[in-house]
Amino acid sequence: MVYSKNFTEIDFPNLPKTIRARITKAINERLITDPIKFGKPLRGRLKGYRRIRVSDYRIIYTVNIVKYKVFVATAGHRDTTYEKAKSTLNKL
């Protein structure tokens, strides 16, 4: 089963190029093949979202199992990513 994604490497211009490449690779290799298996569920205000770890960086995403889609909410350094994801939720 293959999931589709809503993400391109240019979506995160503030990250160093090497980190963007590693995040893109993680999305293409892990999230597209099995986002439930590789991701850890989040709690609290981010309940319903999952995360995968790429070194000190995190990718926050949600999965639509019915449509086989992965929505990447945000990616960034672990110190700021969770707050950034919460602010993204406030805008929805």
Report each predicted region and the residues it spans:
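Enriched for short, Lys/Arg-rich terminal
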Residues: 2, 13, 62-92
